[in-house]
A protein has these predicted regions:
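Conserved SAM-binding loop of SAM-dependent methyltransferases across substrates and taxa
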Residues: 53-66
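Class I S-adenosyl-L-methionine
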Residues: 157-198
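Mobile active-site "lid"/loop adjacent to the S-adenosyl-L-methionine
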Residues: 89, 106-148, 159
Length: 198
């Protein structure tokens, strides 16, 4: 067994996620942020960008209940979650007409993105790829997020964080940084929240 496998199996959040039936440990990141920072109503409409394998979508289903309006999008196929509309498509290639099928869900109350590029280790390249994903998320925000809506975006500390923070300050009344406990301490990831769309 590799060192990586040992670390993963020994990770408490990974064990908790498996025991609770979540598809990924990332479920606990969203749970913490929703409980502390983002208050959702049962009637909220939410889009989960980069949803595979579905951990965040599962948490949304828990928080929103049966009469849910959840849209999940990912380039990879995702096992069905009851009450969720799933579109298999690259976020970069999203078009306005892709939202026709869920027009009754619009506008969204919350846009989520847990997306990250495949890391090369080349800082400039990785940041550029991350910013491309952030721009795709911001496009959804600009077109489909309702007045006073919120956004949650995963970024890397450094250039992509600075870029996203500046972009959100132009769009939202409140901008905040979050590092959930389930995010590995040595990870460069951090989450940025925009609340109350102007």
């Amino acid at each position: 067994m590799s060192h990586k496998s040992n670390y993963r199996d020994g990770d408490s959040f990974t064990k908790q996620a498996k025991k609770a039936g979540y598809r990924s440990r990332a479920a606990y990141k969203l749970k913490e942020i929703l409980e502390k920072e983002l208050k959702l109503k049962r009637s909220s409409s939410v889009i989960d960008l980069g949803s595979f394998p579905g951990g965040w979508t599962q948490v949304l289903r828990e928080f929103l209940g049966n009469k849910t309006k959840i849209t999940a999008i990912d380039i990879q196929p995702m096992k069905k979650i009851e009450g969720c509309f799933f579109l298999q498509k690259s976020i970069i290639d999203l078009k306005d007409e892709d939202f026709e099928e869920i027009k009754e869900f619009l506008p969204f109350d919350l846009v989520l993105s847990d997306m990250a590029p495949n890391i090369s280790g080349i800082k400039e390249r990785d940041n550029a790829l991350m910013i491309n994903l952030i721009d795709s998320t911001l496009s959804v925000v600009d077109k489909f997020l309702g007045k006073k809506g919120s956004v949650l975006i995963k970024v890397f500390q450094g250039e992509s964080l600075d870029y996203t923070r500046a972009a959100l300050k132009k769009r939202f009344d409140k901008v905040k940084i979050s590092k959930p406990k389930a995010s590995r301490p040595n990870s460069n990831e951090i989450y940025i929240i925009g609340k109350e769309l102007k």
